[in-house]
């Protein structure tokens, strides 16, 4: 643990009812302030379980999660916007339950609308948005509470390939510009290389078996793909999770909050 960390996961253990081995088996993870960390791994490896435990949506058998210096916000695979509210109203919804509801909060929402390229859609309803636009609104809603840690559970998986490529570069710029610490789940290696400062390969019952730094010139998409393929083959031959969770894909609580959670 370091004073430079925004998030620490310490010894996280989780076993689902009926399972013989834990899906999270003493997982440790640190994400630095302003760092973007991307988690790759097979379906059923426990990636989403880990993210939900960090968010406080899933209880742990043991271990803890520390969020340092601010709030936490989460973006899910589907935008899940309220259909009867406008784009602006969806973004400001979370602010209604906070003390910072004044002019400064409204100005920040205006800034987000501009920065995210959706200011012209402020009065639109969700039914009038494309998939990429709706997910931008979902991300803006999470950023509106000014989180220190942003969790993203396959946020671009529902988008078509062209839109996904556009949005992933935009999302990386937003994360860097706002200085947010981000933890993202992805199945797409090229997406992970765009979004992440570090990429970790996650395995059920093991945790992170390999972590790469994307600023390392020796790290390539081919190297990560080969590791992904070899470990998926290993997992298939040595299952550590129930059969219902063993579908493998190759790419195409106890929460302690150090300074408030949003």
Locate the predicted segments by residue.
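Helix-to-loop junction immediately C-terminal to a conserved catalytic motif
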Residues: 55
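Conserved ABC ATPase signature
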Residues: 125-129, 133
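A short, proline-enriched helix->beta-strand linker immediately N-terminal to the Walker B motif
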Residues: 144-148
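Catalytic Walker B motif of ABC-type/P-loop ATPase nucleotide-binding domains
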Residues: 150-154
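Helix N-cap at the start of a conserved alpha-helix in ABC-type nucleotide-binding domains
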Residues: 161-163
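Conserved H-loop
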Residues: 179-185
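Conserved beta-strand-loop-alpha-helix hinge in the C-terminal portion
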Residues: 202-233
């Amino acid at each position: 643990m370091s004073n430079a960390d925004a998030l620490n996961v310490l010894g996280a253990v989780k076993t689902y009812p009926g399972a013989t081995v834990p899906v999270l088996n003493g997982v440790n993870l640190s994400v630095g302030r302003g760092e973007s960390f991307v988690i790759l791994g097979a379906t059923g490896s426990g990636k989403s379980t880990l993210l939900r435990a960090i968010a406080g949506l899933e209880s742990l058998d043991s271990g803890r999660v520390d969020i340092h210096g601010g709030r936490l916000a989460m973006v899910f695979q589907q935008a899940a916007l309220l259909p009867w509210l406008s784009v602006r109203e969806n973004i400001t919804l979370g602010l209604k339950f906070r003390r910072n509801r004044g002019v400064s909060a409204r100005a920040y929402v205006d800034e987000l609308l501009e920065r995210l390229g959706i200011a012209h859609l402020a009065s639109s309803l969700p039914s009038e948005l494309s998939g990429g636009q709706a997910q931008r609104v979902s991300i803006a809603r999470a950023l509106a509470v000014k989180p220190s840690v942003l969790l993203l559970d396959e946020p671009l998986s529902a988008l078509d390939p062209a839109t996904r490529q556009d949005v992933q570069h935009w999302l990386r710029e937003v994360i860097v510009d706002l200085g947010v610490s981000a933890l993202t789940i992805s199945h797409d290696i090229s997406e992970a290389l765009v979004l992440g400062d570090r990429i970790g390969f996650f395995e059920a019952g093991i945790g992170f078996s390999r972590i790469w730094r994307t600023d390392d010139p020796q790290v390539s998409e081919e190297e990560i793909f080969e590791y992904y393929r070899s470990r998926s083959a290993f997992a298939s031959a040595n299952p550590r999770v129930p059969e219902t969770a063993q579908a493998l894909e190759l790419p195409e609580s106890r929460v302690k909050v150090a300074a408030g959670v949003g």
